[in-house]
């Protein structure tokens, strides 16, 4: 018999039955080998046909296995196997049936016909498992769809819809889809387009995360509930699985063949199916090779004729990039824009989804948590869309509470560690025989017994609290299942089941849930099971670094004493410290304008008076790290073209993909201190970029993304007017500021100066300030030496001397560092290296007899 006359699937089964016979040491390949291979074949026709015709497939597998084990085994035949006479007869019978059906190729389902026709073991097994010729014939006709087998790959293109699509209406019927709240206008618009005679294909366009896929799920739910116009009733919504369609298409034309099979099956459905293609831009160019058609071109004829009801979904950027380029494809779709929902709509959506998340995480989600998720995500997460970002916050906060419930509470964990520690100590003391050890052992055993009793009591409380929680969650799950069953009964018109559920089971479960929640309401000592607005704020703070959680008493105290903290490192400069501290306090108290940066300052003053030091101190105060400061030296932006380095190169230029120096830093750390050092040295065009940062707290980078500056403190430093500050240091602060501002207004444009919150003029440092700074600098030196094992002590005489030597009214505090290096550090280094100073002893550094002396 010519093997080429069989379909590809049948050929695969024939080769599989041979290896099955060899593996079992059978001399002949029997029909039982072939039926086993066909039944186990992935993507084959036999298993679906048998299931559809009411055959017990599990029993059939067992019977075939038993029959295989009965076959005689021949050891040492060198792997030589032959077809049995019975199998040859069955294959010839398959050929005969193929000719009767006018098939060009022999398909695998004909083997079932042949097996039932011919008397023998295989026929008996099939009949025993419930196979009837008429039912199998009907199942074969249904799976063939009235078509002949004219192609060797005919079997692979069958049941294409089952293989390559997901039935959303079936999922909606079984209650597996999340409820869709709101979005009535968009769903109505999509239905309106679907009702058209031709080009009845809406494409949902919107930003990622606004709920495009949810609209199609909402449509599927409405179809299931019968809440659609007559033209859409009883239709199915199928989602095309592009991954399954492309996966495994090895040969040229295989992908097109699969897609064509899907389209053919859809045309047979005669408009009873709505095909949903998520990420529809992937169709453009999918399967495209040299000379081959892509998926988009295969879809065009069906879309234009109205044979294919298709709903697409894609983002604005991808629609522009892929679909708008192909005008012929674009004209076949009707655009439906999906906007981001408002905060109020998002709250309604979250309230609808709340129950699903409560059941999944086994926690309670409070209403303040829902409101906080919508409002806080809208304000602080600017690069993503509602409701997606709000749902993420709820999901993660619920997950963190669930993790706490599942893990051992902290008091229990602490006690357990203490008990282990005491037991180890007990083991060690039991070996000792002196009186002191025995007394210690007695005390220890007493403490151990007390701790173990305490642990047992706490563990009991923990277990009972966990049991209470799991009880209410179990009732919630049962209630959810009952509600789904009620919907299914309503659709099926089963009035008896509806009344049983609606007036019996559901009220009973609701009563049980109320009782369980009442017992939960009693204060729990160990477990937190409620997601509140505080948990939402915590999750947001971890994700963005922005402190939005309620302030602890410690933090309130810290903010009230902020000036004292800043003055520990910044000496003098009362006005500057007050201005910065007030801006931070306004922000944390929630009083600052939400659409502008926390604060924007221009620090003016001579060199070395503490302008940059104040920024570092502020970063350390806010973030416990000086690295949280984004420092940009504006002297690097003296040329006009260097402006692009701040926001990123425009398209077509080198470095376009890298992003901007300023914008990327703020995108990664939205809550930071931005220091623009020596701002007057930058090109005038740089200030045009800063205008929108200072006014609206936003900046668009080279790639068109909007970067949020609303949670940053923008500080610019400048030396403008420093000569006036030096010359008029004895005048009042307001007079000196007026003089300096006249110079500043000549250099900067009025619109730039007008947008700055506060311009702060720094005073020149006096001798007493320099002495205080010397004390701070020497303290840092002492800390550095401490790591090497040396303890440094400085005398007042030394401080006076360093303050005198390091004082320079023109250069501020910077000469002080040089004075410390030359007068102290150089001689210290020599003495340490020579061995004159040894670690572990106090080193006193003094100024006497006109020289600095270090002694131990």
UniProtKB/Swiss-Prot annotation:
CDD domains assigned: AAA, RecA-like_ClpB_Hsp104-like
Protein name: Chaperone protein ClpB
Segments of this protein annotated with the region C-terminal: 765-856
Record region (NBD2): 555-764
Pfam families xrefs: AAA (PF00004), AAA_2 (PF07724), AAA_lid_9 (PF17871), Clp_N (PF02861), ClpB_D2-small (PF10431)
Region (NBD1): 159-340
Main localization of the protein described in the UniProt heading: cytoplasm
Domains as described in the record: The Clp repeat (R) domain probably functions as a substrate-discriminating domain, recruiting aggregated proteins to the ClpB hexamer and/or stabilizing bound proteins. The NBD2 domain is responsible for oligomerization, whereas the NBD1 domain stabilizes the hexamer probably in an ATP-dependent manner. The movement of the coiled-coil domain is essential for ClpB ability to rescue proteins from an aggregated state, probably by pulling apart large aggregated proteins, which are bound between the coiled-coils motifs of adjacent ClpB subunits in the functional hexamer.
Annotated residues for binding of ATP 1: 206-213
Segments forming a coiled coil: 391-523
Lyase listed as a keyword: no
Region (Linker): 341-545
Keyword vocabulary terms for this entry: ATP-binding, Chaperone, Coiled coil, Cytoplasm, Nucleotide-binding, Repeat, Stress response
Phosphoprotein listed as a keyword: no
Region span, Repeat 2: 83-146
Residues involved in ATP 2 binding: 605-612
Positions of the Clp R domain: 3-146
Subunit annotation: Homohexamer. The oligomerization is ATP-dependent.
């Amino acid at each position: 018999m010519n093997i080429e006359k069989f379909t590809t699937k049948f050929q695969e089964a024939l080769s599989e039955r041979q290896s099955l016979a060899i593996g079992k040491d059978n001399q002949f390949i029997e029909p039982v080998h072939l039926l086993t291979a066909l039944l186990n074949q992935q993507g084959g026709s036999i298993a679906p046909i048998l299931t559809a015709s009411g055959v017990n497939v599990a029993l059939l597998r067992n019977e075939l296995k038993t029959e295989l084990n009965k076959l005689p085994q021949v050891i040492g035949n060198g792997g030589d196997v032959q077809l049995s006479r019975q199998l040859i007869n069955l294959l010839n019978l398959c050929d005969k049936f193929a000719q009767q059906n006018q098939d060009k190729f022999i398909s695998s389902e004909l083997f079932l016909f042949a097996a039932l026709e011919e008397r023998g073991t295989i026929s008996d097994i099939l009949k025993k498992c419930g196979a009837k010729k008429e039912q199998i014939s009907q199942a074969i006709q249904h799976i063939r769809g009235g078509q002949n087998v004219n192609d060797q790959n005919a079997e692979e293109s069958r049941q294409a819809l089952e293989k390559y699509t997901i039935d959303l209406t079936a999922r909606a019927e079984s209650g597996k889809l999340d409820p869709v709240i709101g979005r009535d206008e968009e769903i109505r618009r999509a239905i309106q387009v679907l009702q058209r005679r031709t080009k009845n294909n809406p494409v949902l366009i919107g930003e990622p995360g606004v709920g495009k896929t949810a609209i199609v799920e909402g449509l599927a739910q409405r179809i299931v509930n019968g809440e659609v116009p007559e033209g859409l009733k009883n239709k199915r919504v199928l989602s095309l699985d592009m991954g399954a369609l492309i996966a495994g298409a090895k040969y040229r034309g295989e992908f097109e063949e699969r897609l064509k099979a899907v389209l053919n099956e859809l045309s047979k459905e005669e408009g009873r199916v709505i095909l949903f293609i998520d990420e529809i831009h992937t169709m453009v160019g999918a399967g495209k090779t040299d000379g081959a058609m892509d998926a988009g071109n295969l879809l065009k004829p069906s879309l234009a004729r109205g044979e294919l009801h298709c709903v697409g979904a894609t983002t604005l950027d991808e629609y522009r990039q892929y679909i708008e380029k192909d005008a012929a494809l674009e004209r076949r779709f009707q655009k439906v824009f999906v906007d981001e929902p408002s905060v109020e709509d998002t709250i309604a959506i979250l309230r609808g989804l709340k129950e699903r998340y409560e059941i999944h995480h086994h926690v309670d989600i409070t209403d303040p948590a829902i409101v906080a998720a919508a409002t806080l995500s809208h304000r602080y997460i600017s690069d993503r869309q509602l409701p997606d970002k709000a749902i993420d916050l709820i999901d993660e906060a619920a997950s963190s509470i669930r993790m706490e419930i599942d893990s051992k509470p902290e008091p229990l964990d602490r006690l357990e560690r203490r008990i282990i520690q005491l037991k180890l100590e007990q083991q060690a003391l039991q070996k000792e025989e002196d009186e002191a050890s025995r007394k210690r052992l007695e005390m220890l055993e007493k403490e151990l017994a007390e701790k173990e009793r305490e642990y047992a009591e706490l563990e009991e409380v923990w277990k009972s609290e966990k049991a209470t929680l799991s009880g209410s969650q179990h009732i919630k799950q049962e209630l959810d299942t009952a509600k789904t069953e009620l919907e299914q009964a309503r659709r099926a018109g089963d009035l008896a089941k509806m009344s049983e559920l609606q007036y019996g089971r559901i009220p009973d479960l609701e009563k049980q849930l109320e009782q369980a929640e009442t017992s939960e309401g009693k204060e729990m000592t160990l477990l937190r099971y409620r997601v509140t607005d505080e948990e939402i704020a915590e999750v947001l703070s971890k994700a963005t670094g922005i402190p939005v959680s309620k302030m602890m008493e410690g933090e309130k105290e810290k903010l009230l004493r902020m000036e004292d903290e800043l003055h520990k490192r910044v000496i003098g400069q009362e006005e500057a410290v007050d201005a910065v501290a007030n801006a931070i306090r306004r922000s944390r108290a929630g009083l600052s304008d939400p659409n502008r940066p926390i604060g924007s300052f221009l620090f003016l003053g001579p060199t070395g008076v503490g302008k940059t030091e104040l920024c570092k101190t502020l970063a350390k105060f806010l973030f416990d790290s000086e690295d949280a400061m984004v420092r940009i030296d504006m002297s690097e932006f003296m040329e006009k073209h260097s402006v692009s380095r701040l926001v990123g190169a425009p398209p077509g230029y080198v470095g376009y993909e890298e992003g901007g120096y300023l914008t990327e830093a703020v995108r990664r750390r939205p809550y930071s201190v931005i220091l623009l050092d020596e701002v007057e040295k930058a090109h005038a065009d740089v200030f045009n970029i800063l205008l929108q940062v200072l006014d609206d707290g936003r900046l668009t980078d080279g790639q068109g993304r909007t970067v949020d500056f609303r949670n940053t403190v923008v500080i610019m430093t400048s030396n403008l007017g420093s000569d006036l500050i030096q010359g008029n240091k004895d005048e009042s602060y307001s007079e000196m500021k007026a003089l300096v501002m006249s110079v500043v207004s000549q250099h900067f444009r009025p619109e730039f100066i007008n947008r700055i919150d506060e311009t702060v003029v720094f005073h020149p440092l006096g001798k007493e300030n320099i002495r205080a700074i010397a004390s701070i600098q020497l303290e840092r030196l002492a800390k550095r030496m401490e790591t090497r094992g040396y303890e440094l002590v400085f005398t007042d005489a030394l401080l006076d001397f360093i303050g005198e030597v390091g004082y320079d009214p023109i250069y501020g505090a910077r000469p002080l560092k040089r004075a410390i290096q030359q007068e102290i550090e150089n001689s210290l280094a020599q003495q340490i290296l020579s061995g004159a100073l040894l670690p572990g002893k106090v080193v006193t550094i003094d100024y006497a007899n006109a020289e600095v002396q270090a002694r131990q």
